[in-house]
Amino acid sequence: MIILYSPAFTNHLKENRYFYKVKHLLENPVYNALLSGDKQLSHGNDEVKYFDEEVSPFAGFEEGNENGFSRLYESLNPGRKILYANPETIPHPGGWQVQHEIKGLQFIYQGSKLFSNDFSNVTPLMETNVDEMVQLARLTKPGPFGKRTIDFGHYHGIFDNGKLVAMTGQRLHVGDHTELSAVCTHPDHTGKGYAFKLLQHQLQIILKNEQQPFLHVREDNQRAIALYERMGFIVSRPMNFYFMKRI
C-alpha cells in the first residue's frame, strides 16, 4: 500500500525527529490495549475487541486480519458507531459507513522526568464530576468522551470558582505505554498554562508507574503540536482515525 504523508508529517521526518521504524505495539494501539492494560474494559472475542460505547467508540483487531471488519459487523448491532485507528490509510470496508476521517500523529514522550510545577490546584475528578467533564469535552472537542470514559482512570482537572475549566486524563494502556488524553481547556481560560500543568501532572503519574507516555493529535493542530514538542514529545508515526457506523 502506498502512503501519502501530509506536508506536516513529511516535515517532521525531514527534521530528523524520532520515528519508530520497527514493528511496535503502538502501531495497533487499540487492539493491543484491549489485550493488555485495558483488558478489564474489553468486549468482543478472540478476533475483535471493542469498548462499551459509553467508555469509548474504539474498536480493533489483530494486524493483518483481513476479516476484521466483517467480524466486527457480525458482533455489533446496526447503527453502532466505532472508531478505528491505523497508521496506514485503509479502503472503506463493506457494511460500514465511514462518517469522518482524521489524519493524526502519534507522539512518544522523551523529555525530562523532573517537574517543578505547583500542582496544588490540580484536583482528582470523580463520578460526581462526569456531567461537567462531558460538557467541557463537548465544548472543546478533544475527542470522543462519554459518560464512562472516566473508567480509563486518572482524570484530573482545574476548577475556577467551583467550575471545571480544564482537564486531562489517561485513555489507552498499551503494554508499558500509557496514553494521555482529553486535554482540554475552556475557551474563557486559555493562556493560563492549565493544559501545560495538567499534562506535566499526568506525566508525573505515568512515569512514577514506570510507564512510557504517548498521545495522539490531529496533524493540523499546530498549537497543540507546538506545546507537546516543547514538553519533550517526539513524533513516532502517523495515525489515521476512521469514524464508522455499522449499516
Regions found by a protein language model. Give the residues of each.
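Acyl-donor-binding surface of acyltransferase catalytic domains
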Residues: I2-I3, P7, L13-G44, V48-N117
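A short, internal acetyl-CoA/4′-phosphopantetheine-binding micro-motif in the GNAT/acyltransferase core
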Residues: A59-G60, V183-G191, R218
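Conserved acetyl-CoA-binding loop-helix of GNAT-fold acetyltransferases
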Residues: G68-R71, G191-Q204, A226, R230
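Conserved acyl-CoA
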Residues: L72-P78, K197-Q212, I234
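Conserved active-site alpha-helix within GNAT-family acetyltransferase domains
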Residues: H92-G95, F196, E219-R237
